[in-house]
């Protein structure tokens, strides 16, 4: 093979590895932000609900949307490259499935936030909707989501409920359109994408480890039973010997 062709192939491999690492980092960042958003959703209507929580939800939601756009652009460009090998294409398709699944979960959580915010509007007095006697701070959770990359946000919370509902509706529509646009640009059939590890192997390893634990427990239990049985036999022999000695002394 000519030296020039080898050099071009090496450059193509390096470029793909760089693109793949960027896509993996972007997908992992989106996973973290969506997980933090889901955790914040659970506190709506509880004792930790406040204006600051609603603002944290809004900022985390905006951060997740920015990461989603970044993910979509990177993966779409990479998957539409006709020079990809079959192996490289399979790796990107797995990342695509992870990204699209995470985006669907985020869309469901946004719809849940809209329904909960409509059913449990926050009062102007900043009082919790449910008085449980326990309180908690959610700023640490939101900070983990917002610190994935440095972005400046306004610290002023949204004061009008109607404006908040309108913003959530618009953001839900954006994510919905993004999912539709992704399916039209890149046709990746999820049921054709294979995982890195086989589920049977994972189940087998889990079954083997559980079997070892059960066997060790059974052995310990059997040893305990043997010890108890030996003790009972010893007591019976001692009692028989004492009775025999007593009868012999009487006779």
From Swiss-Prot:
Membrane topology: Single-pass type IV membrane protein
Cellular localisation: Membrane
Keyword Glycoprotein included in the entry's annotation: no
GO terms classed as biological process: G protein-coupled receptor signaling pathway; negative regulation of signal transduction
Endpoints of the signal sequence: none
Keywords from the UniProt entry: Coiled coil, Membrane, Signal transduction inhibitor, Transmembrane, Transmembrane helix
Principal location class: membrane
GO cellular component, one term: neuron projection
Protein purpose: Regulator of G protein-coupled receptor (GPCR) signaling. Probably acts by regulating the activity of some 'R7' family protein (RGS6, RGS7, RGS9 and/or RGS11).
Family statement: Belongs to the RGS7BP/RGS9BP family.
Name of the protein in question: Regulator of G-protein signaling 9-binding protein C
Species, as recorded: Xenopus laevis
Lineage: Eukaryota, Metazoa, Chordata, Craniata, Vertebrata
Gene (UniProt): rgs9bp-c
